[in-house]
Amino acid sequence: MKSRAAVAFEVGKPLQIVEIDVAPPQQGEVLVKITHTGVCHTDAFTLSGDDPEGLFPVVLGHEGAGIVVEVGEGVTSVQLGDHVIPLYTAECGKCLFCRSGKTNLCVAVRATQGKGVMPDGTSRFSYNGQSLYHYMGCSTFSEYTVVAEVSLAKINPEANHEHVCLLGCGVTTGIGAVHNTAKVQPGDSVAVFGLGGIGLAVVQGARQAKAGRIIAIDTNPAKFELAKQMGATDCINPKDHDQPIQQVIVEMTGWGVDHSFECIGNVEVMRSALECAHRGWGQSVIIGVAGAGQEISTRPFQLVTGRKWMGTAFGGVKGRSQLPGMVEQSMRGEIQLAPFVTHTMELKDINQAFDLMHDGKSIRSVIHY
């Protein structure tokens, strides 16, 4: 079938809006009509060429919501007309990782997903006879996309897709990092580095967890008002201080914060986030994705004196079994999604969404088909 799509043909070049061919879903696969998709920093990261797994030409997009229009052989968990969110972190329930109960990092489709193809090793997308790569198992920048059954969360059909599409990545990652990875407790102190979609979601999650002090850090003060609406108690611009930001936070709090979160993907900021953690028990969670070949560093003394350094993917959330509940929470107003959507636009304007992101003028732009 034909589908409108925004295709990244080359590194660093604007996406091209073209009509691609989408092959039918094969065994264990589902054809989904995407209704809305967010434009995430991870899409921009891959487009920039810094992503070590980046492949071109590719149909990007991984933060979407849509409706099932066709199912392949053997699919039982969803049917025609179901409302779904594609998942870049699958949940098969059968692999070693799923059965461990210790992680959400299912490996059922990981090997092929990282190669930009479906589980059988081939692509469902083509343009003028040329095969196009899939992206993170989702490819929501195409109006019609094919997704593995194990990579689909079935959601309440009454949910607003313009909002809940953000649960496909950023908001879930941030809130999940607070509850699942850091396990923030009432009264704990929190520092959040980077106030994009994920950082603001961490702030919101920390407020849900009843954290005592929530310190929001960004070099763009225009983001502070929304951070305070989300629950931040303090907002800091590192440019306003001569000292390293970790020293500023340690002096503000006495010994540092109970939990810090790096939501940017900058290895120097990752170090700052660790070193502002409380001596003896502070922990720092890396959420941001750094560029290819970059490494983190700190003095071992920082860890010997009780700090913990950890990371998280999709906030530790199991997509098929837990994401539907987060959709319900959003419908009850327990998770705020509307404030994240600063711009909405048609697919033809998708490159504007990247410009707004790079200029720091948006939290999330949502594309509607």
Swiss-Prot record:
Disulfide-bond pairs as recorded: none
Coiled coil: none
Cofactor (UniProt): Zn(2+)
Transmembrane regions listed in the UniProt entry: none
CDD domains in UniProt: alcohol_DH_class_III
Biological processes annotated in GO: formaldehyde catabolic process
Main localisation: cytoplasm
Annotated residues for binding of Zn(2+) 2: 92, 95, 98, 106
EC number: 1.1.1.284, 1.1.1.1, 1.1.1.-
Reaction catalyzed: S-(hydroxymethyl)glutathione + NADP(+) = S-formylglutathione + NADPH + H(+); S-(hydroxymethyl)glutathione + NAD(+) = S-formylglutathione + NADH + H(+); a primary alcohol + NAD(+) = an aldehyde + NADH + H(+); a secondary alcohol + NAD(+) = a ketone + NADH + H(+)
Location in the cell: Cytoplasm
First-tier enzyme category under EC: oxidoreductase
Residues the entry annotates as binding Zn(2+) 1: 40, 62, 169
Family matches, as Pfam families: ADH_N (PF08240), ADH_zinc_N (PF00107)
Keywords: Cytoplasm, Metal-binding, NAD, Oxidoreductase, Zinc
Gene Ontology molecular function: alcohol dehydrogenase (NAD+) activity; S-(hydroxymethyl)glutathione dehydrogenase (NAD+) activity; S-(hydroxymethyl)glutathione dehydrogenase (NADP+) activity; S-(hydroxymethyl)glutathione dehydrogenase [NAD(P)+] activity; S-nitrosoglutathione reductase (NADH) activity; zinc ion binding
Stored SMART domains: PKS_ER (SM00829)
PROSITE patterns per the UniProt record, alphabetical: ADH_ZINC
Cofactor: binding details: Binds 2 Zn(2+) ions per subunit.
Record family assignment: Belongs to the zinc-containing alcohol dehydrogenase family. Class-III subfamily.
Function statement: Has high formaldehyde dehydrogenase activity in the presence of glutathione and catalyzes the oxidation of normal alcohols in a reaction that is not GSH-dependent. In addition, hemithiolacetals other than those formed from GSH, including omega-thiol fatty acids, also are substrates. Also acts as a S-nitroso-glutathione reductase by catalyzing the NADH-dependent reduction of S-nitrosoglutathione.
Protein name as it appears in the record: S-(hydroxymethyl)glutathione dehydrogenase
Organism: Synechocystis sp. (strain ATCC 27184 / PCC 6803 / Kazusa)
Lineage: Bacteria, Bacillati, Cyanobacteriota, Cyanophyceae, Synechococcales
